[in-house]
């Protein structure tokens, strides 16, 4: 009789033997993603013979690529997960999920959220969790203008739009633009649900098979653990992809978006994702699905 250990080793050997083509791996150039993925793409953790071809894009581009099935493994918004979960399985590591880290709705002048109806609102993408939260907050809002997330504050400031939903490092810098925070959508979500806010997670194509997905999961979890234990190791890689961001903002970004939920979603993280997508289904924003999140 072959022991479980021998069977496991043989199975992993097969993964390495058949994985001759690198898997496409999508993530954003934001510091939290480059911080977490650095060990994986630079061979600092055991990938059991799987290699990766990295593709760095803003999160909405990644959402759209996943919608077309063009990436094997990728970061996506949890809003996008609601549209692709039949084809992609969620991984338990690598998520941006937590408290006090949600998108902000900002304006040039202080106005009441009720006065937004009929006004133009810049959003960072149709499949972003930022837009999903805004639609759950007020389903009557309709006049959205999609633009790259790093152009939204300027658009609000010069009056091209009446308001904007900002994400990523913009939450640390909007006050320097003289903008007003009308609403913290993360705080609103936490009050409404009592749960942390699920922003984005890592998914893998279900067609890769359970064994390969499990191997990717282990390598990603080990990579997150490596970076959290050795935070300075990825510094050059982070700054290579965030050249216009100063050290203080970079550190704040990583500190806010990389946490214990990034290591493992845990029960609370899974409940938060389920709650968000349940509400999105009930609102008719995403299709109803009975497929489990995980493989």
Predicted regions and their residues:
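A structural signal for short loop-to-beta-strand junctions that line the ligand-binding cleft
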Residues: 19, 23-24, 87-95, 120
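Beta->alpha turn/N-cap motifs
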Residues: 58-60, 69-82, 148-149, 166-172
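N-terminal amphipathic/basic-hydrophobic helices that include classical n-h-c signal peptides
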Residues: 1-18
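A local structural motif
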Residues: 45-55, 137-147, 286-291
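Pocket-lining segment of extracytoplasmic ligand-binding domains
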Residues: 149-240
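Secondary-structure end/capping motifs
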Residues: 209-279
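Bilobed "Venus flytrap"/periplasmic-binding protein-like clamshell domains
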Residues: 21-42, 103-162, 169, 271-274
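Hydrophobic/proline-rich hinge and linker segments of small-molecule sensing/allosteric domains
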Residues: 90-113, 190-207
């Amino acid at each position: 009789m072959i022991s479980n250990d021998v069977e496991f080793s043989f199975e992993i050997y097969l993964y390495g033997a058949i994985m001759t083509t690198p898997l496409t791996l999508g993530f954003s150039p934001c510091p939290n993603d480059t911080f977490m993925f650095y060990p994986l793409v630079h061979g600092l953790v055991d990938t059991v013979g799987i290699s990766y071809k990295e593709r760095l894009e803003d999160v909405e581009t990644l959402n759209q690529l996943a919608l077309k099935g063009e990436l094997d493994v990728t970061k996506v918004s949890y809003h996008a997960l609601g549209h692709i979960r039949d084809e992609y399985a969620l991984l338990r590591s690598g998520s941006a999920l937590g408290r006090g880290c949600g998108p902000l709705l900002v304006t040039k002048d202080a106005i009441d959220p009720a006065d937004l109806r009929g006004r133009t609102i810049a959003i960072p993408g149709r499949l972003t969790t930022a837009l999903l939260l805004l639609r759950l907050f007020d389903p009557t809002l309709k006049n959205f203008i999609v633009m790259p997330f790093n152009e939204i504050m300027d658009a609000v400031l010069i009056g091209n739009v009446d308001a904007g939903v900002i994400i990523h490092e913009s939450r640390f810098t909007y006050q320097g633009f003289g903008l007003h925070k009308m609403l913290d959508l993360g705080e609103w979500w936490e009050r409404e649900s009592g749960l942390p806010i699920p922003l984005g997670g890592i998914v893998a194509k279900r067609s890769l098979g359970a064994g390969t997905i499990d191997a990717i999961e282990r390598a990603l979890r080990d990579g997150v653990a490596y970076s959290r234990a050795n935070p300075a190791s990825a510094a050059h890689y982070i700054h290579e992809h965030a050249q216009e961001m100063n050290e203080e903002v970079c550190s704040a970004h990583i500190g806010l978006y990389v946490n214990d939920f990034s290591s493992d979603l845990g029960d609370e993280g899974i409940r938060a994702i389920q709650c968000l997508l349940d509400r999105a289904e009930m609102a008719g924003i995403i299709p109803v699905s009975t497929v489990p999140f995980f493989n």
